[in-house]
Amino acid sequence: NEGKAKCGNTAGSKLTFKSADECTKTGQK
């Protein structure tokens, strides 16, 4: 899963697997 990154909301209660680019843009603040 090199192309996937684990992203969570600010509470960390939910994790979703998105593309690394999506993770960078929407998964992290």
Curated annotation (Swiss-Prot):
| GO cellular component terms given for this protein | extracellular region; membrane; nematocyst; other organism cell membrane
Q: Name the domain of life.
A: Eukaryota
Q: What is any one GO biological process for this UniProt entry?
A: killing of cells of another organism
Where's it found, cell-wise? Secreted; Nematocyst; Target cell membrane
Alphabetic keyword roster: Cytolysis, Membrane, Nematocyst, Secreted, Target cell membrane, Target membrane
The answer on whether this UniProt entry bears the keyword Membrane reads yes
Q: In the UniProt record, does the keyword Membrane occur?
A: yes
- What is this protein's function? Cytolysin that shows moderate hemolysis and moderate myonecrosis.
Q: What is known of its domains?
A: Circular dichroism reveals that this peptide has random coils and small alpha-helix conformation as main secondary structure.
Name of the protein described by the UniProt record: Cytolysin Oshem 1
Organism listed in the record: Olindias sambaquiensis
